[in-house]
Amino acid sequence: MATLFIADLHLQTEEPAIVAGFLRFLAVEARQADALYILGDLFEAWIGDDDPNPLHREMAVAIKSLVDSGVPCFFIHGNRDFLIGKRFARESGMTLLPQEKVLDLYGRNVLIMHGDTLCTDDAGYQAFRAKVHNPWVQRLFLTLPLFIRRRIAARMRAGSKAANSSKSLDIMDVNAQTVVAEMEKHRVQWLIHGHTHRPAVHELSANDQPAFRVVLGAWHHEGSMVKVTPDNVELIAFPL
């Protein structure tokens, strides 16, 4: 009995070792789970469900195989793949979730999210996020030819990398008050998220009780998952 959480794989054809590691994860660890939750940034970039990138089809088939085996897969959008839509969800068998979701996991109420909305000290990013999450902006972008979308996405990634290089690490991490506010809004003592690439289990106080924030790591040289069982919540790093 276990529910698994992963995030920030940033899958791309230029990183075949990470792709292979994810395929092994789907075929082995995930097959033993009650459910798999992917908390955003499964892909390095997503410019629309109509992008014929072979990697996308390969991942859809692999995830669908997991779902068809009896393990449901749920997905929360990240800041890199927020344009994943109903078509890819249908092809992969994934269930799309809202950006914040409370789960009842073996008697624990657990809030899950990608985590970028917690980084409220980074005002520049939050302003950018508000723009690209505007439904009208997204609809307009998706009407553009694929080659133009690719150019825009590449330019945005380059701009993001340049901007982040000049920001302090503290600004790009979560805001502690925002974390507590979210946990108290949802009346939970557990929060699982990704985005910051800083795997850790943090103890804090929320709702006048001890609380825990579990941060998933990015998949670079190793994989990262959170395994929730009736008895434990465990952050696990594993070789790819």
UniProtKB/Swiss-Prot annotation:
Chain residues that bind substrate: N79, R80, D122, S160, N164, K167, H195
Co-factor binding details: Binds 2 Mn(2+) ions per subunit in a binuclear metal center.
Sites where the protein binds Mn(2+) 1: D8, H10, D41, H197
EC number from the UniProt entry: 3.6.1.54
Topology relative to the membrane: Peripheral membrane protein
Subcellular location: Cell inner membrane
Family as reported in the entry's similarity comment: Belongs to the LpxH family.
Alphabetical list of PANTHER family matching this protein: UDP-2,3-DIACYLGLUCOSAMINE HYDROLASE, UDP-2,3-DIACYLGLUCOSAMINE HYDROLASE-RELATED
Protein name per the record: UDP-2,3-diacylglucosamine hydrolase
